[in-house]
């Protein structure tokens, strides 16, 4: 780590530098930053795309689907100078936008029933994860608040009894008039996955999902062409060491008969649950649902 220090180097790919670089319109601060980077690299942006190209790209980006033939004809025939911005606003209001970007965010954050730490309700948990994000995308909740709801999520509150926690959660599983899961302030399943139990796994997942950075190499060694050292990784990993998600029982509840272990043992004995028999899992799930109602 101490012997190698990466130095960022920009190497232009053309002679379009300085005064030779053409004027490029940038209507927003983001565009200005992009153009500044392109100017440094000597890359001239592509020409403005055609209406047909724009409509196809914006539909795929925002809704994951292609425009209908009638929509294409109407858009191309329009003479309005604002038709592109209006089309973007229109697509952002479509249900397909919320569905498509919820799917993307679930993918980025690792929503996978097979990795959720509950063999009985993992499919329900994956669905609740999706619904929690979908509601926020649909109602235009800012991304920083969505990220906060995932990163700072809690399940059982400090000092909350298991009985009170179990009663509150059971309302989401009722057959009639269940409480929508998206009404919860936070979504705790991000930290409930089986593949993020260790602090280093949490660090890798967080860096990829929320920072867009892959730091696997720094976990073992200093990469000669990357800025992250193994020491950086260990410091970053330390942030995630206090985070835990497990069915632990506080000392005050041990022996009370009202904790996770004792309640699950009671239900398993009632249905004759055997982990080796798959059909027992369905009976166990049905019994838990029955008690929730």
List each language-model region with its residue ranges:
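Short, structured secondary-structure elements
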Residues: 1, 7-274, 280-286, 293
């Amino acid at each position: 780590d101490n012997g190698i220090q990466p130095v960022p180097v920009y190497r232009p790919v053309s002679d379009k530098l300085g005064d030779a670089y053409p004027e490029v319109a940038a209507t927003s601060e983001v565009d200005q930053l992009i153009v500044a980077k392109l100017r440094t690299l000597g890359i001239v942006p592509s020409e403005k795309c055609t209406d047909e190209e724009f409509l196809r790209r914006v539909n795929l980006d925002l809704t994951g689907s292609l425009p209908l033939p009638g929509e294409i004809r109407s858009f191309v025939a329009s003479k309005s100078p604002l038709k592109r911005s209006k089309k973007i606003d229109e697509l952002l209001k479509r249900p397909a936008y919320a569905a498509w970007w919820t799917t993307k965010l679930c993918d980025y954050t690792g929503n996978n029933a097979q990795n959720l730490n509950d063999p009985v309700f993992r499919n329900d948990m994956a669905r609740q994860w999706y619904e929690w994000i979908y509601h926020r995308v649909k109602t235009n909740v800012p991304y920083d608040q969505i990220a906060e709801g995932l990163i700072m999520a809690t399940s059982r509150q400090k000092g909350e009894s298991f009985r009170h926690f179990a009663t509150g959660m059971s309302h989401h599983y009722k057959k009639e008039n269940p409480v929508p899961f998206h009404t919860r302030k936070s979504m705790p399943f991000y930290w409930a996955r089986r593949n993020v139990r260790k602090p280093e796994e949490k660090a890798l997942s967080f860096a990829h999902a929320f920072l867009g950075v892959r730091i696997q190499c720094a976990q073992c060694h200093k990469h000669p062409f990357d800025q992250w050292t193994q020491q950086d990784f260990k410091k970053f990993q330390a942030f995630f060491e206090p985070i835990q998600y497990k069915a632990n029982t506080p000392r005050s509840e041990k022996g009370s008969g009202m904790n996770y272990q004792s309640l699950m043992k009671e239900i398993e004995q009632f249905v004759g649950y055997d982990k080796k028999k798959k059909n027992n899992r369905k009976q166990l799930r049905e019994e838990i649902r029955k008690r929730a109602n």
